[in-house]
Amino acid sequence: MNGDDAFARRPRAGSQIPEKIQKAFDDIAKYFSKKEWEKMKSSEKIIYVYMKRKYEAMTKLGFKATLPPFMCNTGATDLQGNDFDNDRNHRNQVERSQMTFGRLQGIFPKIMPKKPAEVGNDSKEVPEASGLQNDGKQLCPPGKPTTSEKINKASGPKRGKHAWTHRLRERKQLVIYEEISDPEEDDE
């Protein structure tokens, strides 16, 4: 129950990192430049270790898993972690986005709540995906509004004070309720 125990278990800045964790860090370090790796906190490094482990586990089980974005850019560094000096790889380093903890949120798909279908619209909705999941390709031209934008524009003014009323259904037959008395009250 003592809060000081948590600090005792946490590795200190000057302490040695266990060999197992260091080996996992070395496996991940080859995907980043030396500068990027030095800037990263250990918590970010651990996240990348787990991402790689999960990817490898899924592929070993036979599932088609997408390659984590940081693993796609193997050409930026050599095995010793030294940056290449030729123009092609330098351009790749500049073009690829720097993976930081804040950008990890964009990797995972955003879960969008399902919107109720409009009357007369029998088409099924397709969930939207984040930009990184689509490999940077836009699904529709930038000038044209997407289907979800069209739905939002069309249904925007209709949704007023009682947005939930369209979910109610009208009863076809009237239901007559009878008052049922408790058996204990009948005995009296």
UniProtKB/Swiss-Prot annotation:
Residue intervals of the KRAB-related domain: 20-83
Function: Could act as a modulator of transcription.
Any single GO BP term: regulation of DNA-templated transcription
GO cellular component: nucleus
Cited SUPFAM superfamilies: KRAB domain (Kruppel-associated box) (SSF109640)
Origin superkingdom: Eukaryota
Matches recorded under Pfam families: SSXRD
Name of the protein in its database record: Putative protein SSX9
Expression across tissues: Not detected in any normal or tumor tissues.
Stretches the record annotates as Disordered: 114-165
Composition bias type Basic and acidic residues, residue spans: 115-127
Keywords assigned by UniProt, alphabetized: Phosphoprotein, Transcription, Transcription regulation
Phosphoserine carried by residues: S123
Keyword hit for Transcription: yes
Amino acid composition bias (Basic residues), ranges on this chain: 156-165
Family: Belongs to the SSX family.
